[in-house]
């Protein structure tokens, strides 16, 4: 039995914009350029390799005050990836926060991030199901400051506030941690899954003795009534509906006898034995978050995000095979901690670590991605069974962006934009041969899925579009 790991293959589907940051900030004309009114994130190494391997003299390329756009032009090919806006607008900001990627510019969700979110949910649900477990004694308490004995300070720094509790629940050290028996792989996506998200801060303020929702301007730190008047920030995110596979494994040898490796005695009830049980635990935790967040937005008349969260809650309640989970940047204080503190303990921790303002709800801000209006909460994913898909052409970012712009400009449906001549006209003037070929492959795939390529729907615009794609008017 030693070394026996039971592994299942699952799908991680992104439900709302997901950002796992690299810690780096990308800058215009240093890391990306503007191409077709959207950012083109440049692979500088491949661009320089192309220049050096070509006819361009190395000293001419690297000497002086070089411009990234000029280097890309000299290379004769775009190395990197386009970054369409999630909201559909055409915009190239001065800076943006980078999504973590591998050496090939492919975004991924580290297994450690996914496992950390699972750990948080397991802790919260285990504490909910074991009200007799007294965790208060394991939390930090006030103590006299070493520097100033007249003042008090927490017995532990904020980043270690739950350390004793986590050791008591999961295990005294990494070798004895019950989650050592769970293995989670990285989840690897494609660059085409990335979108540029415009993030805004909804903030609760006091006005004439009453609480109300406003929008935090991140430049001036002032509050605005209209979100359009409040600046936010831009981040790379994995787009909703993007999906990739990963593996989840249970080490059956370790789980066969917890006492041999010093795991906690309650480990068997803490770590679900298979995905079907894990799914129920994660969904119980997700349901609490959904319900609390729906109530929060409803209280402050923030209808757009309230509807999005209610829609996700309804979807989860009708889904009998998947687990719903929130992770990574933007999940907020409650998402990071698991929101398991009772009211007295929360009040104590707020006072001890000076969390939030007195007489105000905590936390009082929410980060929302703009899609027409700030409405999308961040970080929600669905973990479900892996089903092999029939190979299809990858949806191309240029086609996605062009369709969105046509829909917004003409206020038309997606099918109308796809079959119309405006998309064909925009495609026809593309200068990059590789981009043009890839975009056409995507357009053809979409047309064939709807049966239009062989039996086009009636209309002059569709007839013209088909002629352009087939080269009949060349």
PLM feature segments, named:
Residues 1-56, 172-177, 181, 187-474:
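Basic polyanion-binding and macromolecular-assembly surfaces
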Residues 64-113, 117-231, 327-343, 347-351:
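Extended, compositionally biased
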Residues 30-92:
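Aromatic- and Gly/Pro-rich amphipathic surface segment
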């Amino acid at each position: 039995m030693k070394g026996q790991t039971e592994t299942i293959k699952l799908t991680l589907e992104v439900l709302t914009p997901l950002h796992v940051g690299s810690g780096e900030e990308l800058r215009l004309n240093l890391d990306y350029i503007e191409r077709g009114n959207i950012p083109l994130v440049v692979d500088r190494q491949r661009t320089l390799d192309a220049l050096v391997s070509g006819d361009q003299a190395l000293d001419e390329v690297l000497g002086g005050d070089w411009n990234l756009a000029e280097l890309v032009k000299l290379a004769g090919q775009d190395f990197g990836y386009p970054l369409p806006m999630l909201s559909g607008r055409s915009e190239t900001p001065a800076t943006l926060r980078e999504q973590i990627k591998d050496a090939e510019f492919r975004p991924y969700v580290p297994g450690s991030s996914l496992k950390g979110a699972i750990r948080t949910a397991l802790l919260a649900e285990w504490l909910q199901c074991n009200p007799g477990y007294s965790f208060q004694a394991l939390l930090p308490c006030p103590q006299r400051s070493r520097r100033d004995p007249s003042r008090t300070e927490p017995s532990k720094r904020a980043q270690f506030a739950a350390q004793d509790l986590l050791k008591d629940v999961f295990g005294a050290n990494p070798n004895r941690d019950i989650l050592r028996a769970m293995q989670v792989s990285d989840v690897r996506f494609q660059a085409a899954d990335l979108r540029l998200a415009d993030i805004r801060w909804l903030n609760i303020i006091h006005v004439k003795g009453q609480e109300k929702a406003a929008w935090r301007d991140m430049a001036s730190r002032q509050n605005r009534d209209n979100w359009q008047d409040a600046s936010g920030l831009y981040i790379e995110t994995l787009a909703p509906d993007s999906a990739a596979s990963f593996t989840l494994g249970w080490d059956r040898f370790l789980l066969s006898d917890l006492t041999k490796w010093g795991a906690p005695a309650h480990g068997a009830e803490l770590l679900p034995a298979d995905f079907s049980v894990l799914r129920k635990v994660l969904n119980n935790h997700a349901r609490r978050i959904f319900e609390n967040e729906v109530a929060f937005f409803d209280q402050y008349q923030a209808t757009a995000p309230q509807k999005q969260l209610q829609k996700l809650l309804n979807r989860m309640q009708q889904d009998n095979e998947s687990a719903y989970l929130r992770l990574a940047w933007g999940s907020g204080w409650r998402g990071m901690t698991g929101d398991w503190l009772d009211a007295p303990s929360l009040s104590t921790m707020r006072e001890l670590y000076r969390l939030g303002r007195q007489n105000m709800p905590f936390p009082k801000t929410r980060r929302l991605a703009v899609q027409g209006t700030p409405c999308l909460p961040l970080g929600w994913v669905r973990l479900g069974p892996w089903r092999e898909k029939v190979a299809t052409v990858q949806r191309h970012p240029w086609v996605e962006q062009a369709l969105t712009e046509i829909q917004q400009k003409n206020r038309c449906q997606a099918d109308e934009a796809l079959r119309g001549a405006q998309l064909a006209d925009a495609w026809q003037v593309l200068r990059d041969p590789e981009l043009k070929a890839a975009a056409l492959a995507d357009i053809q795939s979409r047309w064939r899925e709807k049966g239009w390529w062989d039996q086009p729907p009636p209309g002059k615009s569709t007839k013209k579009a088909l002629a352009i794609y087939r080269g009949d008017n060349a």
